[in-house]
Amino acid sequence: MCLRFFSPVPGSTSSATNVTMVVSAGPWSSEKAEMNILEINEKLRPQLAENKQQFRNMKQKFLVTQMAGFLANQQNKYKYEECKDLIKSMLREELQFKEEKLAEQLKQAEELRQYKVLVHSQERELIQLREKLREGRDASHSLNQHLQALLTPDKHDNSQGQDFREQLAEGCRLARHLVHKLSPENDTDEDENDKTKELDKVQESPAPREEQKAEEKEVPEDSLEECAITYSNSHGPSDSNPPHKNIKITSEEDKVNSILVVDSESSQDEWQDALNILLENQNDDEEEEGKAPVPPQVTLWICGLKLQESEEKEVLQDSPEERVTTSCSDHDVSQSYQPCEGTFLALVEQKVCSAQDVASEHSNSKGEETPLGFPDTKYCWKDEKDERMSQKVAFLLDEKNYNSKPSSIPNTTLQGSFTED
């Protein structure tokens, strides 16, 4: 058996060798040789792969070294060291700009979120305000209707005091409800407190009225007499009252106004006491002068004034304008007398018949004949005092036509029947 080994071929990068085997033996030797070749090939393949990887690494290192050399040459060429600070500052500013831009974007996003929350809150407030305006509109409509009903005169109702207070309390409640609905704070506790205070005020309202009654009862008796004189002067004719229409008004105006607002119940007793005092004073004065006492027609006439005064007071409570026209006696009597003319004349006509009967009884008790007719709108009395009283009753009957035909009765006649010293 002859074996020949050949050296590697020049220029080849592989470390494998070509083996030529000359086998002169049989088939068994050829198979063994093939097995050896395969084993050698299997052993050399990993070495070949490793050598290829080393070659690639060497090539990469060469490229890196070549690039480093190129950069070094460029740095030396363009003086990189001098521009190094400038490049760093530019990079720093660029980074800062990016950070500021990012922070601004975040801030804008936060502001946008806050604006959205504010818009939603304002939308809710707008809805609440619309609801409040709607409720306030309803409350104002109710208050308007209540005030219209309050200002509408009711001629059928004579007990205006308590109803007027209740209507005022209702008006106050509606006004407070309106203010409460339109106010920014809408708490249920405040509403309950307002209702409690309102109920307390309504319950406490009769107390000041009772105190006012007590104070008016303490007014001296002479002020009642002056009130009667002032009232008779205020209803006198326009031609005869200028000489003395301001005698008692300027000095006793407050007292007269306090008398005019007395309750109907208390005014009845007070007027009765005042009439008794006036009659007693007049009878005493006439007894001292030696004259006959005052006939009872004066009592009837003053009772008519009393009833007219009580009804006029109720009208004054409903209408402040009528209080002004009846209390201010320095104005024209023909204008101020119109609101209560019908009521006063009706009362006078009712009392004239009873005055005739009482006059006849009074004259019959004295044994004198007294005609009860009304010739020339005057009574026929025995003495001068009775004639003056008849003139006063006749003046009341002629008061219907005082605007067109003023009465000629002097003021001294009217004043003398009440203010005889």
Curated annotation (Swiss-Prot):
One of its GO terms (cellular component) is cytoplasm. It is found in: Cytoplasm. Belongs to the NBPF family. Residues 230-243, 403-421 have a biased composition (Polar residues). Residues 190-279, 280-391 form the Olduvai domain. Pfam families: Olduvai. The keyword Membrane does not apply. Keywords: Coiled coil, Cytoplasm, Repeat. Residues 179-251, 312-334, 402-421 are annotated as: Disordered. Residues 194-217, 312-333 have a biased composition (Basic and acidic residues). It comes from Homo sapiens. InterPro entries: NBPF (IPR055306), Olduvai_dom (IPR010630). Encoded by one of the numerous copies of NBPF genes clustered in the p36, p12 and q21 region of the chromosome 1. This is Putative NBPF family member NBPF7. Residues 87-143 form a coiled coil.
